[in-house]
């Protein structure tokens, strides 16, 4: 798997990224549910595979369940594996608040669920919702 550098950040990622919204079990979006055991097994397999880049979001699943499940596996592994990058997204709250305070709170929520002190790559999720 080829590695690319993200702009001028120095962050290295594989050319492919594993999206993780489905492991948050979002049947309204995908038409099927994903059980917790299946989600954890999927993330364990991803951690051993050639794709070293995961994309998740504070908003995937109920109460950030996608991040929580990824965090469970990261904790089992003793942290983020060498050469692996976890990216997440900040999301507005249920009122649509996308203020600086909300962005900070979203980052802290993600750090807690993912068991990561530092998030190397964070996106704004669907910022058109506030325009």
What are these regions (language model features)?
Residues 77-98, 125:
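Structural motif corresponding to the early beta-alpha repeats
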Residues 4-6, 91, 104:
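Small/flexible residues
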């Amino acid at each position: 798997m080829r590695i690319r550098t993200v702009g001028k950040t120095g962050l290295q990622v594989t050319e492919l990224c594993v999206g993780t919204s489905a492991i948050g079990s979002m049947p309204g979006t995908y038409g099927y549910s994903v059980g917790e055991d299946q989600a954890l097994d999927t993330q364990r397999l991803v951690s051993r595979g050639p794709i070293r880049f995961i994309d998740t979001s504070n908003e995937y699943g109920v109460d950030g369940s996608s991040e929580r499940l990824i965090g469970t596996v990261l904790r089992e592994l003793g942290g983020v594996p060498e050469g692996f990058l976890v990216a997440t997204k900040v999301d507005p709250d249920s009122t649509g608040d996308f203020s600086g305070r909300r962005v900070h709170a979203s980052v802290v929520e993600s750090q807690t669920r993912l068991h990561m002190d530092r998030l190397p790559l964070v996106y704004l999720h669907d910022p058109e919702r506030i325009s």
